[in-house]
């Protein structure tokens, strides 16, 4: 195997051992050292907590007002019945919520096969036992709400939010939406040519039958990849630093002093002092101008009057003067 020392190995699906319809082992190799645990732990957490599925969330049993009661002619108490319903494996197509009904009488077990449902619902394990009737005259009728969701949602989180709307006799059930019942991974040593420091990831999992184990791993990998897309397309979202713009000067300050139409004497005195723009002139004080050779009080008065007619005066302060357009000249 030739390649750059910085090039990562890409794993390939080596083997899928289908132990049963709900139990499978998936082997993935080769992986760079350490990536077996990195990928295995990430997939395990997603498979246990983030896989969508369907679960029983509410139950109404005729003649039962609360979960701490019993029903005549039924071997199990209500809490046991709710626990058995919690393990019901249901596959629902095209709907987020369905209501199932169950009516059974006479001695014998009550199983998932006794549930009445429409064509959008499939009971995966019809032999799943819900309760047992112990008397010929015993009967049980119930309405079962099945909803689609993700992860695990205990009934306690819904009690307070639904207290005002939930009628007496409607029993809430802890909802375990995840179709994955058990998952474990193991990292073993792998070898590719001369490299012996590689990983082999072996994932073993069991589902409730509503999803194929191979499909479950495929979905988990898709979820992980979608979450990582934000890092793949990472962009610097920081706001660009806004540079403080220097204040713009009044256009009149950028005009040459010749535009003031001063007398020749005054204009020549200003040019001799390198005062070429009106902006240069207004920053001078009266004392500074009087020190200018050949510029007397009469010329000073003329300059002040001309500036005043334009809304300007001597002794003004102009920050960042001269502007770049003048400084470059």
Curated annotation (Swiss-Prot):
InterPro entries named in the record: DNA-dir_RNA_pol_insert, DNA-dir_RNA_pol_RpoA/D/Rpb3, DNA-dir_RpoA, RBP11-like, RNAP_asu_C, RNApol_insert_sf
Pfam families associated with the record: RNA_pol_A_bac, RNA_pol_A_CTD, RNA_pol_L
UniProt keyword terms in alphabetical order: DNA-directed RNA polymerase, Nucleotidyltransferase, Transcription, Transferase
Residue ranges of the region described as Alpha C-terminal domain (alpha-CTD): 249-329
Region Alpha N-terminal domain (alpha-NTD), annotated ranges: 1-235
GO biological-process terms attached to the record: DNA-templated transcription
Family membership noted in the UniProt record: Belongs to the RNA polymerase alpha chain family.
Name of the protein this chain belongs to: DNA-directed RNA polymerase subunit alpha
Species name: Salmonella choleraesuis (strain SC-B67)
